[in-house]
A protein has these predicted regions:
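Metallo-beta-lactamase
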Residues: 14-19, 24-26, 30, 113-165, 169-241, 249-252, ...
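Short catalytic-loop micro-motif centered on adjacent basic/acidic residues
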Residues: 55-58, 83-84, 161-163
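C-terminal regulatory/interaction regions
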Residues: 2-8, 260-287
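A cross-kingdom feature marking charged/low-complexity
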Residues: 2-12, 240-260
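Conserved beta-strand hairpin/beta-sheet module of binuclear metal-dependent hydrolase folds
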Residues: 20-73, 173-184, 188-190
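Active-site HxH/HxHxD metal-binding segment of metal-dependent hydrolases
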Residues: 63-65, 71-150, 247-266
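Hydrophobic/aromatic beta-strand patches that form the interior of the parallel beta-sheet core
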Residues: 36, 84, 110, 144-146, ...
Length: 287
């Protein structure tokens, strides 16, 4: 189903969100010496490199140019043995769905136990304020099911799992080596700071807001100040910026939250080039 879902999003969401000043993905490149990203239209997938190990965070769309753009970064798809999945929406799992080209067919997937209930068909994913149910996603890769607070060690990489539900029921956020927090679709960065992610795409907006507040509380209690790396709006190392509007929603059709620096149509990726991917580290926001 991922190829159809990918094509639907490319056409429908391009039209729906054009000019709304919502999506501001990073272009393909490196954030620093450890973290790289590939741009797939409005979305980013990430790679964490430590020694000889490269861990992938989310699997993006069923995207024809993924292997090409990974080559710009010097990353071979065959080197990916572990993929952390924040949630099961098609712009985060497309490359591992059953009808994908199979670039990562041998990789092990790590996904929240609650989120996996979408994959088993126990629950259905609802979007557009619950008006539309998405088709069930099918993934054949080996899976490791995760729980809130679980800590993993993958080839010397420490990964801590935070359950942050709301956008989906089992959305997981990953803290990698205590420094990088991959937030998926829990945070949306506007020009004036972070908001709870796009309201029309959430299972439960009240829960999403509550979950963000709890995440901030956990981080502050432990004195953690990671890089916040989002799925659609870049990254920041400024915690105050990241949680500036945690009690508010990004509501794209009400113009309450927008970013004038966002692309008019983020599905136009003509500026995402190999040359630009090698031109220096990608800049953060809120700095």
């Amino acid at each position: 189903m991922s190829k159809k879902a990918t094509e639907f999003q490319r056409k429908a969401m391009s039209w729906m969100y054009r000019g709304k000043e919502i999506f501001k993905p990073l272009n393909t490149g490196w954030i620093d010496e450890n973290v790289a990203c590939v741009r797939e239209w409005v979305a980013n997938i990430f790679f964490y490199r430590k020694g000889d190990t490269t861990i992938m965070i989310d699997a993006g769309y069923n995207y024809d140019r993924l292997a090409e753009k990974m080559s710009w970064l010097g990353i071979d798809p065959k080197s990916i043995h572990h993929i952390l999945i924040t949630h099961q929406d098609t712009d985060h799992v497309g490359a591992v769905e059953a009808d994908s080209p199979g670039l990562f067919r041998n990789a092990k997937l790590y996904i929240g136990e609650i989120e996996n209930r979408y994959l088993t068909g126990e629950v259905r994913r609802r979007v557009i304020y619950h008006l539309y149910k998405l088709p069930q996603v099918t993934i054949n890769n080996e899976k490791v099911l995760l729980h809130d607070g679980q800590v993993l060690d993958i080839d010397g990489v420490r990964i801590e799992c935070f359950l942050v539900p709301g956008h989906t029921w089992g959305h997981m956020v990953y803290l990698v080596d205590g420094k990088y927090l991959f937030t998926g679709d829990t945070l949306w960065f506007g020009a004036d700071g972070g908001y709870s992610f796009i309201s029309s795409l959430a299972e439960d907006n009240k829960l999403a807001v509550k979950s963000l507040a709890l995440l901030e509380k956990k981080l502050r209690k432990r004195g953690l100040h990671p890089l916040f790396i989002t799925g659609h709006t870049g990254w920041t190392d400024n915690m105050e910026f990241a949680f500036a509007h945690k009690n508010e929603l990004c509501s794209p059709f009400k113009k309450r939250a927008h970013d004038p620096n966002a692309l008019y149509d983020a599905y136009d990726e003509s500026d995402d080039t190999e040359e630009n991917s090698k031109s220096g580290y990608l800049k953060g926001v809120g700095r």
